[in-house]
Design a protein with these regions (language model features):
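Polytopic transmembrane helical bundles with strong interfacial aromatic enrichment
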Residues: 1-119
Length: 119
């Protein structure tokens, strides 16, 4: 699974750069641009987190893989909801907080995998 997390982290990083360019040049409204920028920041940090999970997963076991899954689902939910609001004015209900919870769960699972690893 470690190669999958690295590949998904690289994809998320690539899309972060693309979204940053779109946000900087295609959103004329300041409020919408600030909202979208928060999604770009969260996406950037968690792209790096996925790369870290990919490097750690061979030693971190199942908990590390669960952390990677939580990061991916959290990115899709949180950033998707933020981008929908910024670009289309669509309120996605509980999707953003659910995504935020999944991102936090990913960090907790990653930390727990480090504490439980046998080294």
């Amino acid at each position: 699974m470690s190669r999958l997390w690295i590949a998904l982290g690289a994809l998320a990083g690539l899309l972060t750069v693309a979204m940053a360019a779109v946000v900087a040049h295609a959103i004329p409204d300041d409020t919408a641009r600030r909202i979208a920028h928060s999604g770009v920041e969260m996406q950037a940090w968690h792209a790096l987190a996925l790369l870290g999970v990919g490097l750690w997963a061979p030693r971190g076991g199942r908990l590390a893989d669960l952390a990677g899954a939580a990061f991916v689902l959290g990115l899709l939910a949180f950033c998707g909801a933020v981008y929908a609001l910024a670009f289309a004015g669509l309120h996605a209900g509980p999707l953003a907080p659910t995504g935020g919870f999944l991102l936090m769960a990913g960090w907790a699972l990653l930390g727990l995998s480090a504490l439980r690893a046998r080294t």
